[in-house]
Regions:
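Soluble periplasmic/extracytoplasmic beta-strand elements of cell-envelope proteins
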Residues: 1-5, 24-28, 45-49, 62-64, ...
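Short acidic/polar hinge/loop motifs at secondary-structure boundaries
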Residues: 5-32
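Short, glycine-/polar-rich solvent-exposed loops and beta-turns at beta-strand/coil boundaries
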Residues: 15-20, 37-42, 121, 157-160, ...
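N-terminal periplasmic accessory domains that precede
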Residues: 35, 41-65, 128-130
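Membrane-embedded beta-strand positions in outer-membrane beta-barrel channels/transporters
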Residues: 45-47, 127-129, 163-167, 184, ...
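Outer-membrane beta-barrel transmembrane strands
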Residues: 121-139, 146-148, 230-271
Length: 271
């Protein structure tokens, strides 16, 4: 069981929290401490407390940014166009009989293309985080916005993510009344790697060029078997988009010393 600021959290809510927004994490493992949460806490309770601003009456703005570069560390050892031509010539000059050449796969088109290199890139990813913390005599507020853009090594793949969060705490009547409000919004767009394009890299003729003289994609000799890997990546791009909105409110009243009344309300919606 996971509680964020005293309210039970879903997996989506946990994923929405940026590490820089977390103030404290504690674990309740003994039965006595977890008993107040019922049977759902049988395996323990994880308590996550988010930042709500420092109660010093000041306003603070923080920014953190990162840039990362990724390259493919190893790749398949495929024939180059020249190696392909040499192999074909050796086979033609030997007693080896070629099987049926489906789609003219063994034809020499005069190019010398490294298809794995053509569909990969140096991926540039960047992350940005900005936060605002403010407080007054009766309240504390912390707001943050995170933007992550992860570019995939394979063309067209990657992930873009935006996280917004605001946490506010109000105290009145000598702290006998406390109200906590937490709102979070996440927008994600993930573009997975098109695996069929990787298969085409393995079987595509290395003597063919990616583009024709007019700039259009070079078609496969047999379109039912061979498809241009670059064209395939652009044509079959799939964007997996979704938005998550979560929020919770908690009110704590202390009418008498040693007596506390607590009410909680939560919302979790994925669109």
């Amino acid at each position: 069981m996971v509680l964020i600021d005293g309210v039970e959290a879903s997996v989506a809510q946990i994923q929405q929290i940026a590490a820089t927004d977390i103030d404290n994490v504690s674990v309740l493992k003994d039965a006595a401490s977890a008993a107040i949460y019922g049977v759902r806490a049988a395996n323990g309770v994880i308590l996550i407390t988010t930042k709500k601003g420092v109660a010093d009456g000041k306003t603070r703005i923080e920014y953190d940014g990162k840039v990362a570069f990724d390259n493919i560390s190893s790749t398949w050892d495929l024939l180059t166009g020249d190696e392909y031509r040499s192999l074909k010539e050796s086979m033609m000059n030997s007693s080896i009989q070629l099987a049926q050449d489906k789609g003219n796969a063994m034809v020499d088109y005069g190019g010398n293309t490294d298809w794995m290199k053509e569909i990969t890139r140096t991926a540039v990813s960047h992350q940005h985080y900005i936060s605002l913390n403010t407080s007054s005599k009766y309240s504390r507020t912390a707001a943050s916005l995170t933007y992550n853009n992860y570019q995939g090594i394979v063309l067209t793949s990657g992930k873009e993510e935006i996280n917004g969060r605001i946490s506010t705490e109000f105290k009145h009547f000598n702290d006998n009344l406390k109200v906590n409000l937490n709102l979070a919004y996440t927008s994600k767009n993930q573009i997975p790697v098109e695996k069929s394009a990787l298969r085409q890299v393995l079987i595509w003729n290395p003597t063919m060029t990616p583009y024709q003289e007019d700039g259009s994609y070079t078609p496969g000799a047999d379109p039912l078997i061979y498809r241009n890997p670059i064209n395939l990546l652009n044509e079959t791009r799939r964007d997996d988009k979704y938005n998550i909105f979560t929020g919770n409110a908690k009110i704590t009243i202390t009418p008498l010393k040693g007596m506390t009344l607590t009410g909680m309300l939560g919302l979790d919606r994925t669109m």
